[in-house]
Amino acid sequence: MSIGKLHKQAKEKVDRSQVYPIGEALALVKEVAHAKFDETVEISVRLGVDPRKADQMVRGAVVLPNGLGKDVKVLVFAKGEKAIEAKEAGADYVGGDDLVAKIQEGWFDFDTAIATPDMMGTVGKIGRLLGPRGLMPNPKVGTVTFEVGKATSEAKSGKVEYRVEKAGIVHAPVGKVSFDAEKLQENLVALFDALVKAKPATAKGTYFKKMSLSSTMGPGINVDLPTVQALVK
């Protein structure tokens, strides 16, 4: 059967006018995934914030309890003892000017970048290359730190960075369709809890406006927010 027909069948199983309790939504996102690869499950949350205002920016990171189901390649800008610490924690690439030179030549074979504060002068040379790709180390999400061992371990175990976009929407992965629905739910709740804690003090009115789930190639599934909020401690 063609990809087009499979996608059409998947869309027909989802009622776009309905909001599904989180348990049903997770079961459905697994059911309608039709690609030949292990699709990523993503959530999209619309928040009642205006990201154009500096005091309403929602940004942070959270370690998902069940990881992301993929091998995360970690690059660390560090030297001396900190370079050794990063390597021992499992970093895939550790260095300084040598890595900067590779990146300037167009090499981006890594998923996340971490740097010690004293290396940021070096990293700054490639900020215009890393920034647009979401790879620039940032202290707000714990990727500019002297605790490179801890940061590397967290990245390897499934740390997800999130940031609200122009329309007040946060997109983030919560696992793979091959995950048990329970594991996906645990990851989703961890991310949702992080968003609750990241609520700006200046945000007025309803904070969580809308939420949907989808797999990489699948249709969006609207989620009943109260069924998620009930799971957050």
Swiss-Prot record:
Organism: Syntrophotalea carbinolica (strain DSM 2380 / NBRC 103641 / GraBd1)
Function (record text): Binds directly to 23S rRNA. The L1 stalk is quite mobile in the ribosome, and is involved in E site tRNA release.
Cellular component terms (Gene Ontology): cytosolic large ribosomal subunit
InterPro entries documented for this protein: Ribosom_uL1_bac-type, Ribosomal_uL1, Ribosomal_uL1-like, Ribosomal_uL1/biogenesis, Ribosomal_uL1_3-a/b-sand, Ribosomal_uL1_CS
Disulfide bond annotation, renumbered to this chain: none
Keyword set includes Transmembrane helix: no
Protein name, entry field: Large ribosomal subunit protein uL1
Family per record: Belongs to the universal ribosomal protein uL1 family.
GO BP annotations, alphabetical order: regulation of translation; translation
Keywords: Repressor, Ribonucleoprotein, Ribosomal protein, RNA-binding, rRNA-binding, Translation regulation, tRNA-binding
GO molecular function: rRNA binding; structural constituent of ribosome; tRNA binding
Record text on subunit structure and interactions: Part of the 50S ribosomal subunit.
